[in-house]
Amino acid sequence: MNLTATWNADYIDAQYERWKSAPDGLSQDWRYFFEGFELAVSDKSTAEKTIDKDWLERQARVQALIYRYRDLGHLLACLDPLAACPIDHPLLNPSAFNLTSEDLDLEFVAPRFSKSGRAPLRTIIQALKETYAHSIGVEFMHLQDPDERNWLLDRMEPGRNKSKFDHTVKRRILDNLFEAALFEQFINKKYIAVTRFSLEGGDAIIPALNGLVEHVAQKGCGEIILGMAHRGRLNVQAHLLKRPYEDIFSEFESCYDPDDLSGSGDVKYHNGFLTDLQLTQSSSLRIFLINNPSHLEAVDPVVEGFVRARQDIQSDQKHSKVLPLLIHGDAAFAGQGIVTETLNMSQLEGYRTGGTIHLVINNQIGYTTLPEDARSTRYSTDVAKMLMVPIFHVHGEDPEALVHVFQLAADYRWKFGKDVVIDVVCYRRYGHNEGDEPYFTQPLMYEQIRQRPSLHQMYAEKLLEEQIIQKDIIDDLEKTINSRLNAAYDAVHGSECPFPFALFYENWEDIEADYSPAPIDTGVKEKTLISLARKLNKVPETFTLNPKLERLLQRRLQAVESGYGIDWAGAEALSFASVLTEGAPIRLSGQDSGRGTFSQRHSVLVDTQSGKSYTPLNELAENQAPFRVYNSLLSEA
């Protein structure tokens, strides 16, 4: 059915009358629509100011076309480096809206696409393609909050969803791409067939991540907690966290035995790293890459918990000081249940962190499994739609688009405190790892990849054409990077047996495997316990307690005062109270944590008249530590 089939002049007349009497009662699109109509007839005399129903119907069709591009423009976007760009889509063709070539030069209302508020249809369509069907495809019309949608529209449409980067930024992107590519090529030559899970094919994430760091630092962010799997992990360590090449190369040397290190034994592409980046003389930012197992996405809730703990410690109620950043693979993001569970936690009171930036390195394959065998959805990121958050699909060989999207994503996260997903459509230059042969299962795909030039070469050609750099700059850049790589390799390879970086950080750096603490006395004086019990087992006079709970609290108090009949839940409450009054905070989380699964805890009491809650463990002393208890999502699988 044609979208405009239900549009008619009577309906438009009715909406127009509503707009004249109460404009705020209509959506922003309708307000723009009729404001544009008034603008269109403003140069006519009063007698001529009547509704041109033919023009209004055409305008309605144009408005429907604009809406369709906002909703489905991503279907026409050029996203896949290994496929030709789509030329047309039947749902986005003007003919689907009864618009013809005769309408192309007629002016219509399009406030965000023109400073005057009006533009020819030809110009509007071109603007829509540049905004929604170029290197970036956006899914955001599923968002139910009109403020979020309008904020995104205001950020994307006037500038065609792109940033005008100066020469300095473009040169920085070039440097990052060369560093990322030459690093992988160097290791491939020096450590032939050694597993490293190369980033090649997804190189554009390096300048994008570096751009994100600089952008969020300006917003007052002091820490990024990063979780990612093995793909590109060493490259990210080297070129985002600035881990020395010597440290990385030492793990490739055959004399290095990770079992010699207490608490280690893991492979090189699982290890974490902590760094403090000095961005300017007055600005620094800490990045902590969390250690990760081979179990894909297992790190996701660990990162979120780490971030929430850091935010609680810093009393960061606005969630602006610590940012969670998760890097996923496309197959794992769609396939692993832990991803969905972690997403579901994002807006829950006990778990929210103010929004996570999710980067999906979409190399369009999972080991040897193609997307059609790995998921039941068009995009690997479709599961994130349940959160009503924007999803940006980006061509993996357009680094400027990716840098732009990361900044837009960060701004959205800081504005609305919600997750945002960036799907980078790229490829992997080798098999699942460097010892894998992809030609066994995807010969056509990998022949195409084999013939494809590296991104750093293509971007260098682009900057040469734009006359931003000269050939000698490229040559010098390549020599400088290779010189650094060779110097680091010589330093490591020439030593008797290099010792790698420290595996423990700050609070953990003095931990020793054979350390055993002496027994300590954890007891509390009887009079202290009785005093705590009296506070735990009473409620304010104005609080109406359930009669059954009133009797339960009385029994608990009597048990403590008599020293006989203390049950498990009562003992737990006393132990919690003693710890809290000594200044140590307590957090309980899990389904039914407040009441207790077997109706035993009752740490949160509910007034039977008002429904308000009261937590005795938070009413023990003025200077006590906080007791936080959160019921959780159901997670039993």
Predicted segments, located by residue:
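Subset of Sec-pathway N-terminal targeting signals
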Residues: 1-37
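Extended, charge-enriched "interface" segments that sit outside catalytic cores
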Residues: 37-205, 221, 529
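Flexible, glycine-rich loop/tail regions that form catalytic "lids" or insertion modules at the edges
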Residues: 57-67, 74-109, 123, 147, ...
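Cofactor-binding active-site loop characterized by glycine-rich and histidine/acidic residues
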Residues: 222-388, 392, 598-637
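Conserved thiamine diphosphate
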Residues: 281, 286, 379-405, 447, ...
